[in-house]
A protein has these predicted regions:
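Extended, charge-rich alpha-helical interface modules
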Residues: 1-89
Length: 89
């Protein structure tokens, strides 16, 4: 996956998680903490929510890794001058 695809996935996962956050009045980070502690009853919504959360974490790690690589390339190409910000097509 490239960064553009990763960002699309991350935004899609955020949207799904926000729907569940509104439904249960709880941030995903808090849900995940309670889930890890075994304090939440298993339900279809919880299983989906945990899946979205874990997948988003994985996608964010991949995004960060690709971004670091891209920044290294931009820095070496700019030779100490400010890096231009270009849209990715």
């Amino acid at each position: 996956m490239n960064n553009k695809e990763l960002l699309q996935d991350i935004h899609g996962l955020n949207k799904r998680m926000q729907e569940l956050e509104k439904k249960y009045s709880m941030l995903s980070e808090d849900m995940f903490t309670l889930y890890r502690l075994g304090e939440l009853e298993q339900s279809q919504d919880l299983i989906r929510w945990v899946g979205y959360y874990e997948l988003r974490q994985e996608r964010q790690r991949s995004y960060t890794s690709l971004l670091r690589e891209r920044l290294l390339n931009l820095r070496s190409a700019s030779a100490g001058t400010p890096m231009p910000l270009h849209p990715v097509v």
